[in-house]
Design a protein with these regions (language model features):
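Gly/Ser/Thr/Pro-rich low-complexity, intrinsically disordered segments
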Residues: 2-191
Length: 191
């Protein structure tokens, strides 16, 4: 138990040293990212993307290698574009993408009715580059959007739930208490 408390203490010190409301910003050094429904332990980047329903299916419409699956649950699609980063639009602009809660579009915050404070993660375009932004403390969606607005052109929420894990190179994204990979059914990845 002391090692867990020590890890939590270090995490809090690091977060509050940055300023609790400022997110961690992790640049992704390529726009060549994809969306997949296959777990790949050898991927350079692998983080949960769209919401996963209790039965393991992916919520909403999504695209893998140019084929569209699922049923739309929102008006907008999040295309993972090879030169533009993320494109938020009513139609697909690439062969890979998913539907998810839009946090920032064209530098404007989208407000949502979600009072729950949770750790948050987003895929965003920051200065023309794709980045992962993650909160240091639990926040509502609106608080998280407000904390990342100054950095982002566009940002979409990424599924964290109780199983928000993943990695980018040597950086590990994990919730402190749970690690239930079997519950996640889709990811953003780089080979």
């Amino acid at each position: 138990i002391y090692s867990i408390l020590g890890a939590i203490f270090i995490f809090i010190v690091i977060c509050f040293g940055i300023t609790a409301k400022d997110p961690f910003i992790i640049p992704i050094h390529t726009n060549d990212i994809h969306f997949t429904d296959k777990y790949d332990s050898s991927a350079t980047l692998l983080i949960p993307a769209a919401y996963t329903l209790k039965d393991g299916t992916i919520e909403g419409e999504y695209r893998i290698a140019g084929k569209t699956y699922g049923t739309p649950t929102r008006k907008e699609r999040i295309s993972l574009h090879p030169t533009k980063g993320i494109v938020i639009s009513g139609k697909w602009h690439s062969d890979y993408g998913f539907q998810q809660t839009v946090l920032i579009k064209n530098r404007k915050i989208r407000y949502h009715d979600d009072p729950h404070k949770r750790f948050r993660r987003a895929l965003a375009t920051v200065d023309g580059q794709l980045c992962i932004l993650q909160s240091c403390i639990p926040m509502t969606l609106n608080q998280f959007s407000e904390s990342i607005q100054k950095y982002c052109t566009n940002a979409v929420n990424l599924d964290m739930g109780d199983y928000g894990y993943g990695w980018y190179r040597k950086i590990k994204f994990s919730r402190i208490f749970k690690y239930n990979r079997d519950k996640q059914s889709n990811w953003i990845y780089i080979e």
